[in-house]
Amino acid sequence: MSEVLDNGQSRILVADDDPAILRLVKAIVEKEGYTVITARDGKEAYKVLQSGEPFAAAIFDVVMPYIQGTELVRYMQSEKRLMRIPVIMMTAEQNSRLSSDSFAAGAVAFLPKPFTNAQLQTMLRMFIRQS
């Protein structure tokens, strides 16, 4: 599937502090043919983003230790090399403000937990093709 990308990127950064969700998302994304780089919290994700490695997309939990997902998106929007990377936000929190905050920060999609494999696969296909 990575051949749909203009720049050949096939890596996706996934950050979530719940190990079970991290494993699930990694498995779904790998099934789509991507290489997954995982981060267990916002600080780890921030370090990965600073490394300069290219990514086709990012998937962040909204609520994480150290640095929230929305703060990561704001950081990405402030960096020229990161601002075009589509970010999908996800959360189990039942708070409509979190979705509006995610979109205001620059996320392209918001995925409430629990979600189905098909929902995440559809979002990946939709937003990576557009990037």
Protein language model regions, located:
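Short, glycine/charged-rich "phosphate-handling" switch motifs in NTP-dependent
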Residues: 108
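Non-catalytic signal-transmission and effector/linker regions of two-component phosphorelay proteins
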Residues: 1-13, 118-131
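Acidic, metal-coordinating helix/loop segments flanking the phosphotransfer/catalytic sites
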Residues: 38-57
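Charged docking surfaces used in two-component/phosphorelay signaling
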Residues: 23-31
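A Lys-centered signature of the CheY-like receiver
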Residues: 113
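The feature encodes the CheY-like receiver
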Residues: 22, 65-66, 83, 95
